[in-house]
Each structure stands twice: as C-alpha cells, then as structure tokens.
Amino acid sequence: MTLAALAAMLWSLPAAAQEEYRQPALENPESWSVVVIPDLQGYAKNEASQPIARLMTAWIADNIERLNVRVVLCVGDVVEQNDRIGNGFSGDLTSVRQWQGMADAFDVLDGRVPYLVATGNHDYTYTRSGARRTHLNEYF
C-alpha cells in the first residue's frame, strides 16, 4: 500500500465514524421503563472489570427521570462464586470482594429507584452445584 493510499483511507475514517451520542428518550410521555441487568459475574470477578458494573448502574441513575424508570431487575449470577475456596476459579477477587463490589455498584440506585436482585446458580456455594446458601442477603 502506498503512502498516498494509506493517507486517503485514514482521511475517510471520520466520515464513517459513529454518530454523536443522543440521550435516550421515551416516544410517549405516558410510558415508563423497566431496566433489566443481565448476569454480572463476569464484571464481579476481576478488579479491572468491576468499574464496568458501576458504569452500568450510573447510567441507569442518570436516566431515571428521562426514561421514567420504575424498577431495575437484576436476573442473578451477581458474582462468579458465592464462596471462593482455593485456586482454580477464574477471576482475581475473593467472593467477599465480588459481593462488595457489586453491592457498591447498586448503591447509586439506593433511594432513587426500586431494584430487585435475584440469585443465579453462581450466587450459591463455591461450585455451581451443592449447598443452596448464598451471601446475597448480606449485601442487598
């Protein structure tokens, strides 16, 4: 590829760039919203990815009024392991730090919008099967 061809290609990139961000809005002013948060365990288990969960809940908090958010539902699998024992599991955080990090992410919603956090299979015991106990009620 010649330098001129490369320059032409790079010059055209801004034209194909993403459009400017537009704030979400309801089409009907009578409408309201339910926000559903999917499995969070992928964000909970690593120090580097926990801020992504905080960005998600901060976005919700910033849009409560604009989208008339009535409730937030988290479908479960909040953490990777309820009780992390030994090595061999993915992630670099203990289960306590996983639970605390996700609870901290939801703090921004406290007193602003009701939210429900369900348990998933990752939120019980230290394997995906076994005793049916969870630390969810200690953090939420």
For each of these PLM feature ranges, what is it?
Residues 11, 28, 65, 109-111:
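Short, structurally constrained coil/turn elements
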Residues 17-93:
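N-terminal active-site segment of His-dependent metallophosphoesterases
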Residues 2, 18-20, 99-100:
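Short secondary-structure boundary micro-motifs
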Residues 1, 43-45, 127:
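Short amphipathic alpha-helical "recognition" segments used for binding
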Residues 7-9, 30, 57, 97, ...:
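Short, low-complexity intrinsically disordered segments
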Residues 84-140:
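Extended active-site neighborhood of metal-dependent phosphoesterases/phosphodiesterases
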Residues 2-12:
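Bacterial N-terminal signal peptides
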